[in-house]
Amino acid sequence: MNIAKLIDHTILKANTTKEDVMKVIEEAKEYKFASVCINPPWVKLAADELAGHDVDVCTVIGFPLGASTTETKAFETKDAIAKGATEVDMVINVGALKDGDNELVEKDIYEVVQAAKGKALVKVIIETCLLTDEEKVRACELSVKAGADFVKTSTGFSTGGATAEDIALMRKTVGPNVGVKASGGVRTREDADKMVAAGASRVGASASVAIVLNDAKGATDNY
């Protein structure tokens, strides 16, 4: 298995510098990761630098809380695509999900999907660590109904990250035709292999190089 082509090479910390982003971009070129996942201000730089390389440009929407308005998320999506993003990872309205406001949650996702239609893949971050199993299933069902391409476990900025159990539940819920992305706490090749075995079709990690080289000592924390 070519694990590199399943990895979104990620850097999303608030103190990320241009030098940090360039390092991630160069590593993505070298190891041929599926994408680089970066904050929106770096999208144009990444798109320019990765032109002609088989590496997608992924960014985040409504990140990390999901607490932006639907209109804001849709605008962020259009803006990111205009600057060169080919994948967007959006955070759901977690509070609305917990309130049982399925209509709002679905509309929130749907508007981002519509903004991205034909131009970028949409991955929906449900923030599993804050949800019950019933809420995880409902979030996945609403994501599929709204037309999302992927569901994703975590932002990497909340109380927990991906677990194999959550990946299995999400895969069972969405079926074979929607992607499942494991993110948050995936730091070693063993972690990544567990997620893929459980049903993940993409892995988000900042320790991507260590994962590919199977070097546990090189793994870094978080995003």
UniProtKB/Swiss-Prot annotation:
What GO terms in the biological process aspect are recorded for it? 2-deoxyribose 1-phosphate catabolic process; carbohydrate catabolic process; deoxyribonucleotide catabolic process
The reaction(s) this protein catalyses = 2-deoxy-D-ribose 5-phosphate = D-glyceraldehyde 3-phosphate + acetaldehyde
Q: Which SUPFAM superfamilies match?
A: Aldolase (SSF51569)
GO CC terms: cytoplasm
Report the active site residues: D89, K152, K181
What the protein does? Catalyzes a reversible aldol reaction between acetaldehyde and D-glyceraldehyde 3-phosphate to generate 2-deoxy-D-ribose 5-phosphate.
Give the location in the cell: Cytoplasm
Q: Which residues form the signal peptide?
A: none
Q: What is this protein called?
A: Deoxyribose-phosphate aldolase
Domain of life, per lineage: Bacteria
Q: Would I find Lyase among this entry's keywords?
A: yes
Q: What is its EC number?
A: 4.1.2.4
Keywords from the named record: Cytoplasm, Lyase, Schiff base
Top-level class of the enzyme under EC nomenclature: lyase
Q: In which pathway does it act?
A: Carbohydrate degradation; 2-deoxy-D-ribose 1-phosphate degradation; D-glyceraldehyde 3-phosphate and acetaldehyde from 2-deoxy-alpha-D-ribose 1-phosphate: step 2/2
Family statement drawn from the similarity comment of this UniProt entry: Belongs to the DeoC/FbaB aldolase family. DeoC type 1 subfamily.
Gene3D superfamilies linked to this entry: Aldolase class I
Output one GO MF annotation.
deoxyribose-phosphate aldolase activity
Which SMART domains does the record associate with it?
DeoC
Q: Answer whether the UniProt record assigns the keyword Cytoplasm to this protein.
A: yes
